[in-house]
Amino acid sequence: MNIEETIEKCEISLKQIKQYDPDPFYVNHFFEQYISLRDKIIEGIFEEADRDFGLFLTKPMTEESFLQKAKIKNDENAIKFLEWFRIKYAEEHKNPYPNFMNKICNFRKKFEKLPDVKIMIRASDRYKDDINQEIQVPLSNKKLRSKNELDIEIKRQLPVFLEIINHKRRDRNEPKVANNQIIASTFLDIENHKDIEIVYTAEIYIPVIKRLVEEARIKIKDLIRNN
């Protein structure tokens, strides 16, 4: 596998999510694609480690199969790499949005689908603890029927949304939200975490996966060099 090409495909999927947001059907489709590519990148890290440590694993490559082969071959460097990777992975997923992504990936692995996608409105310029409000838009085969229907529903919900968010903004001396500063986007819930914005989560995660790849390669070289 060429990890760089897979990362590029992942970034293309992110662009497609942004392009079709807030259509739940297409966002779900491209987010599913994004997560599949993300999982391939993780597998690619172990493919490179397998090649460099000479374990000669067969696909599909998992952490468990990597560990078992490393133990059979008594390859201390490979075992050390896996221990390092698990710690590094946990560190990279401590922050909220990488943690959400990890939970979404685990959900998909377990249930073979993504959590349900919903359309919500939010302030275009976000501040901490701003509210989001779900809107019910007519769908056809889970797709938005028209932008006009979306706009009508946003306008219908706008007065209540603006009243609530601006009450919070006033209390915190934050800028007032105007009518033209509202956008619709796709969100989902995962475990006890509510209203996770899909575009933002996917965007935040790209640097995380790139760091994992870069630092894994450095760690592999260090272990081999110091052998």
For the regions a protein language model found, what residue spans apply to each?
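Extended, well-ordered alpha-helical segments in internal regulatory regions
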Residues: D39-F53
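Acidic, Ser/Thr/Gly/Pro-rich intrinsically disordered interaction regions
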Residues: M1-I35, D50-N227
